[in-house]
């Protein structure tokens, strides 16, 4: 039996419909949101002010009216005292999704501020949003005028607003300049000059914006130079790199910028002209984590699985396997679990190099890294097919405990019969996304570190002892060679004063870091 409409007139239904509309708008399902909106109106429900303005904007924009007509239709709502900054910020994002011009969005913000009179001071969040929109539209002078009129130092902030600084709006302007044409140099000079004239101190948001801009321009050397300036400034001012900084700098070492960072004659790492190496950047990240006022080994706003994956990708792209090993062990150091992405990065770069090594023409008797990783004689290479079966074989190296693998000491104590369950790892189907990982299944880092040890050993340049002595290298075992390479990377990447790691999350890795 269908209930009468009046039986649905209750607060719970009103709240439910509003939440449905908000969810649909967040997912950018505009037509579905309008359908629910019409349902609300038919049932004599009136949406809240902020939501009503968004729906009004959608309905008017869908009718192909001019921007002038849309602006007039929104005037009353923007001027209403109950309309909030939060609502305006959401409206500006919505108008961007509807492909409304930046000039129009800037004028909407202008009308909102003007309607509140001279006693009103917009928050830093709103000012940053508006100057960013104006900068994207090429209205740099107008944006700077906003900053003169609405000094971010005295702007109002709601208690729920994120903590911002005086330079944040300037950083927003620079970040908004997606166009990398040379004429933007003049605009950026104006922005920085404006900061100097008004004594606005630089903070990490400004440096991040400038570093990101150089990356978009394809100038990794300039990005690294800015990073070096930031490190020097951090010695005398309360400004330090954050997780965004390190994420951007690690991307300098991605394959896209390989021509800037690598030799065309080798797969090995080549330092940039400013001598900032990938291992040094990683060391900086660990150092700044450890220098926090209240350091915590297992909780960090900098050291996260995401940033470790970004760093891992950089090391793998340069075939710096000892460095990649240190990154993997950092997961254990901070009691973090690897993600499916971690496994994907390792397997992708290893298999790409295997495919490259096995596919090239070779001289008689020539042995390559890919051959040694797989344990192949050079005569057998021609019969190998690089496919999912081969990838499963490489992944299975993670089940082997060898090459000085300290994680396996006391392993027989895990079961009464002396056996031990394998460490948890995904299959290639999971890694490739062909099969979903079971919900809640944790992944272990140990299989990846075992695979990485084998990748290190496969490097023909791995040497110890006196290079001038014929027996200088032969006297050392493979395990010692691998351990030496890892220790060398660790010394370069982990500061000495950093706390030693605790056991891994599953408490099965008993020994020290290396």
From Swiss-Prot:
Top-rank taxon: Eukaryota
InterPro entries: PPR-containing_protein (IPR050667), TPR-like_helical_dom_sf (IPR011990)
Coiled coil residues, start to end: none
Location of region: Disordered: 405-440
Role, per record: Part of the gene cluster that mediates the biosynthesis of clavilactone A, a meroterpenoid that features a unique benzo-fused ten-membered carbocyclic ring unit with an alpha,beta-epoxy-gamma-lactone moiety, forming an intriguing 10/5/3 tricyclic nested skeleton. ClaR, ClaS and ClaT are sufficient to produce clavilactone A and the function of claZ, if any, has still to be identified. The biosynthesis begins with the prenyltransferase claS that transfers geranyl pyrophosphate (GPP) to hydroquinone to produces geranylhydroquinon.
Protein name: Clavilactone A biosynthesis cluster protein Z
Native organism taxonomy: Eukaryota, Fungi, Dikarya, Basidiomycota, Agaricomycotina
